[in-house]
Design a protein with these regions (language model features):
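Mid-domain catalytic core of redox enzymes
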Residues: 259-387
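Active-site/ligand-binding neighborhood in enzyme catalytic cores
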Residues: 96, 135-265
Length: 391
């Protein structure tokens, strides 16, 4: 007799849910397991926050525009999907960034990594922070390490090692630009544990970075243009990030994909789970995988797991808008010889950052055009649209 067919339900059609469905499909096929895979997505499209809009010769990213190419699991997935040849790197000629100060875009000093200088000469030559701020940052070279390595916020770590000016003018906008969050609320261990490890091992973050980068054969030549984030670690696809999610979907052969299908309740049965879809259909399944982490999850699992419901209820969810602007080259006075710029909170602007998308990756716009992508907090959207000088 054939064993009873099992059913696995995956909730959420973003990159996590899609990848899980694809990997389970592979596993069940390889081991000839009699299991049905159902993937439900509440919206009319797959991909979650990964969304690329293509208009004529324009490639516009509404969500993330890149991924870390240092993650082996991502590259392995691309290889299995046969899209590794479609991966493109950032422009090697402009792997640096700027920080807004007043009305000027100041280059991040060459050889500067997120919160710490590596190359000392360019750092002291930069007008980004005052001479007193630079001296305070150099105290990292002599400050003792912490005796106890309990977690602390990114804000506390930066101020302790490098001072308040370094945080306000450099670390806050650069780290905030990555996570779109307040560094005072971000865990150091959860976001940038490498800096804690550098302090623990080398005492000085600056010395630790220099030794680590040299060991990895990183270029510390002070004439190098590289600064800010390590842009060589970012990559995308020739036709945008949706290449990845569409390629996963195209590989589905035994996945029951259901769009416009919102989970409205989850109930535990004696054997398995009863999942209500759109308040009018019940799916009886053996396993449920929740990949859509949003505020509604807490309500859905309140009865079946009060502990995890309480955990999700404590999570803060931020919202960010991305706005694509297309200009003719002659309209922009700046040379755009970098990947983009970030905006410190102390500048009191309505935007968090701006990416020079058509410089960052090739073939995003027709010849003669420029594509800039601006990041705005949801709370600042009204101010941004109402003010002519929003930028």
């Amino acid at each position: 007799m054939n064993p009873k067919r099992k059913r696995v339900l995956i909730v959420g059609g973003g990159i996590t849910g899609l990848t899980l469905a694809y990997r389970l499909q592979e596993k069940f096929f390889r081991f000839k397991e009699n299991t049905e895979i159902i993937l439900v997505e509440s919206s009319p499209r797959i991909g979650g926050i990964v969304e690329t809009e293509q208009k004529d010769e324009f490639i516009l990213e509404k969500g993330p525009d890149s991924f870390f190419n240092s993650k082996p699991n991502v590259l392995s997935l691309c290889e299995d999907l046969q899209i590794k040849n479609r991966i493109i790197s950032t422009n090697p000629d402009y792997r640096r960034s700027f920080i807004l100060q007043g009305e000027n875009l100041i280059p991040v000093p060459k050889g500067f990594y997120l919160m710490s200088p590596i190359a000392i000469g360019p750092f002291f030559a930069s007008p980004l922070i005052s001479i007193f701020g630079k001296i305070r940052m150099m105290l990292d070279l002599v400050l003792p390490r912490r005796n106890e390595y309990e977690d602390e916020s990114l804000y506390d770590f930066v101020v302790r090692r490098f001072g308040n000016e370094a945080f306000e003018k450099i670390a806050q906008p650069m780290i905030g630009g990555i996570y779109s969050a307040d560094p005072k609320e971000l865990s150091l261990k959860a976001t940038m544990p490498q800096f804690l490890e550098l302090e623990e091992k080398y005492r000085s973050v600056i010395l630790g970075l220099r030794k680590t980068m040299i060991r990895k054969d990183e270029d510390l030549d002070e004439s190098s243009n590289t600064s800010g984030a390590r842009y060589g670690l970012f990559a995308s696809f020739d036709r945008g990030m949706e290449v990845l999610t569409d390629s996963i979907k195209d590989k589905f052969s035994s996945v029951d994909l259901r769009l416009n299908s919102e989970v409205t309740s989850i109930a535990k049965k004696q054997e398995g789970w009863a999942i209500e879809i759109n308040a009018n259909e019940i799916l009886n399944v053996d396993t449920v995988c929740l990949t859509a982490i949003n505020p509604k999850i807490s309500q859905l699992i309140q009865n079946v797991s009060p502990k995890f419901s309480g955990f999700f209820n404590k999570l803060d969810f931020g919202s960010l808008a991305t706005i694509n602007f297309v200009f003719k080259k002659e309209q922009i006075k700046h040379s755009l010889d970098g990947m983009g710029f970030v905006v410190p909170e102390i500048e009191e602007r309505n935007i968090l950052a701006c990416s020079f998308s058509s410089v960052k990756f090739p073939n995003r716009v027709p010849e003669g055009d420029l594509l800039l992508r601006v990041f705005v907090k949801e709370s600042d959207l009204n101010n941004f649209s109402e003010k002519n000088n929003g930028l």
